[in-house]
Amino acid sequence: MAKELRFGDDARLQMLAGVNALADAVQVTMGPRGRNVVLEKSYGAPTVTKDGVSVAKEIEFEHRFMNMGAQMVKEVASKTSDTAGDGTTTATVLARSILVEGHKAVAAGMNPMDLKRGIDKAVLAVTKKLQAMSKPCKDSKAIAQVGTISANSDEAIGAIIAEAMEKVGKEGVITVEDGNGLENELSVVEGMQFDRGYISPYFINNQQNMSCELEHPFILLVDKKVSSIREMLSVLEGVAKSGRPLLIIAEDVEGEALATLVVNNMRGIVKVCAVKAPGFGDRRKAMLQDIAILTKGQVISEEIGKSLEGATLEDLGSAKRIVVTKENTTIIDGEGKATEINARIAQIRAQMEETTSDYDREKLQERVAKLAGGVAVIKVGAATEVEMKEKKARVEDALHATRAAVEEGIVAGGGVALIRAQKALDSLKGDNDDQNMGINILRRAIESPMRQIVTNAGYEASVVVNKVAEHKDNYGFNAATGEYGDMVEMGILDPTKVTRMALQNAASVASLMLTTECMVADLPKKEEGVGAGDMGGMGGMGGMGGMM
């Protein structure tokens, strides 16, 4: 395949054109007064979004060199979204600003490598300053404010996320689903829930809810199929004498064993319920062990030399209450020791750090949540499907932002934190003039998020930025109301992690682009003139009439 090459300024200008076009589309969404972008879909209704990364992902150019520039900045937005969950528009605006200022310096004859070193030094200094300014995000009010800002000033979303986090804890799993009504709804599952229901409907003891409810039950965990009742006789006799109910969690319960359990349950000899173990393969073994630790029981497994015939009441776990429905089993208040549960959580966390698979990481996070707190489901309500998609995306963004805030704390929002972090650059000096220029490029670039927020709100950016820079601490400009004041008191907060990741990712990609000297792309294929020859053959069709 033949290639096309571009060098020096020509290459950088083409790249810059792509970056500018992409940034123009993304930056209109920034701030409380940012606008929507409508994205065409190959089928169905178009998507309306105010999410920077959704806009960036849709953009591709026919011009190959422009497209390269756009794709590199798209990477900035995606990486920021993946690691911090928000701040994609901020990252795009910062990347464009660093690139534009840097390109001017390179065109003026400065050394791109020294500019890059200067930018890197400045990013390090600003990052340290941001972390020093960061305040922990502990209370529900701060969490709600972070969620509100991330969801484009939608207070209902901020409030429901704060409520969900309060109920399931910082470690709990919060999932977002489509709702049925117009309002957002929150449902919380306390304790450990897994998606396996009763094996037989004859175990139901609450006809109203079609569920089996067991108060203060024993829990028998078996890592195999149970088909013979003989294996379980000693355990069943012990449970019957104690007068407490029994939940059996096994790979499967079938045949004679299931029939005997059902008959005993219906006659009231032993109050019992059987469910299949959650998961498959190694994950099933791990989840059975999780349940064992949560309920202070033992998994009966031949792998560790424990047989069902030899099981005693000491091997059984217990809980305050268990509810089994057709589809789910919920264990409430297992009697496991807190120290053992915490050790198990730490062990799963270590596995999360090591795994490279996103799917495995998600499943491990679910296991942590089930052990640590519970699961909350936010059902997003909307009038139309188009609104539902847009709102759901905002809820997910806000959720990521609040998690980031809990992780690394919060700073003043609206671009104020970056303006304050400029002070870290006052005493910073590079090894030469070109590095000093790199530091100045970043000094100017970190004003760009505030400038863009102010511009989108219809105010004069330079006036606002200068006024904010004259003051200190959290003093800033509320673009939603047009007022100046303490950003934290006004509830305008940004997660430190989001601001930090946006800056680091933007500087990383922009400085790479500045040091580019050559670009290589495939030459577009030339269409061969086959059409004319084919059409010529069609002329012979006229003679067909004579053949009839």
UniProtKB/Swiss-Prot annotation:
CDD domains on file: GroEL
Keywords from the named record: ATP-binding, Chaperone, Cytoplasm, Isomerase, Nucleotide-binding
Recorded superkingdom: Bacteria
EC number(s) reported in the record: 5.6.1.7
Reactions this protein catalyses: ATP + H2O + a folded polypeptide = ADP + phosphate + an unfolded polypeptide
Annotated Gene Ontology cellular component terms: cytoplasm
Location of this chain's protein in the cell: Cytoplasm
GO biological process, one term: protein refolding
GO molecular function: ATP binding; ATP-dependent protein folding chaperone; isomerase activity; unfolded protein binding
Protein name: Chaperonin GroEL
Source organism: Legionella pneumophila (strain Paris)
Taxonomic lineage of the native organism: Bacteria, Pseudomonadati, Pseudomonadota, Gammaproteobacteria, Legionellales
